[in-house]
Amino acid sequence: MYFDIKAFLDAQTQELTQRNPAVEKRVELRGGQIETTRVPEVDWSKELQIFYQADINKPALRGAYAVDSVAKGDTLRRTYSRKTGIDNAVERITVLSVVATPAVAQEITATLTQDNPLFFSQKRVMMHTTDGRLSDYQVKGVQKLVLFDTLRYSAAGRVLN
């Protein structure tokens, strides 16, 4: 069984919906100027939707990822890497956790790639927690459609208390 990102995100969504914090968002498109805005109310189920794409804890993907674990002090870094020949968008997920009972994820990063003759897309999603609560998140990506320019983008959010 891999890291249960769905359960993690469901718990974060529930906690954030109850707490209802504002978010500071930063967006950059095509290497242009960074736009920053404060959003007072957020629909957390929609806001975190892209992170659900990193869910590899499905019966069809059992055995599809190699797991590498490195413990250092009170932290554990576990990386799930897609095995060669496996057709799934999630290339890699890394979860940094504090070893406790239960373990608490501090950082989650995932790389999602889609590549076919007409379209290439790669997204790197990242989130951090403080005391088990989401503190910030980020999505960086690139898209390339045949005959069109490459689009690079990044979006980040910081949860305000």
Please give the residue ranges for each predicted region.
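Surface-exposed acidic loop/strand-edge motifs in secreted or periplasmic proteins
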Residues: 16-99
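Post-signal peptide N-terminal segment of mature Sec-exported envelope proteins
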Residues: 1-21
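Generic ordered-secondary-structure signal
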Residues: 10, 15, 63, 114-116
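Gly/Pro-enriched, hydrophobic low-complexity segments
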Residues: 77-161
